[in-house]
Amino acid sequence: MIFKVFYQENADEAPVREKTKTLYIEAESERDVRRKLEGRPINIEYIQPLEGAHLEYEKKSPNFQVLEISS
């Protein structure tokens, strides 16, 4: 499944909406997403599963690129 992760680049600062970034990652579950991203200095705000029409819509974005991280 593909997940969209909303995050802040600096894990030590309070989240500011204008600085929120996104990435796409393939994983089994939200827990798997967190496990794959642990060790990165980011502050995960929200993990959104993408499927169906929503996934197709996101694929049309020029920023859609699935991050490849092995388990």
UniProtKB/Swiss-Prot annotation:
Keyword Transferase among record annotations: yes
InterPro entries on file: RpoY
GO molecular function: DNA binding; DNA-directed RNA polymerase activity
GO biological process, one term: DNA-templated transcription
Entry keywords, A to Z: DNA-directed RNA polymerase, Nucleotidyltransferase, Transcription, Transferase
Entry superkingdom: Bacteria
Gene Ontology annotations for the cellular component aspect, listed alphabetically: DNA-directed RNA polymerase complex
Stored NCBIfam families: PRK13667.1
Function: A non-essential component of RNA polymerase (RNAP).
UniProt name for this protein: DNA-directed RNA polymerase subunit epsilon
Recorded name of the encoding gene: rpoY
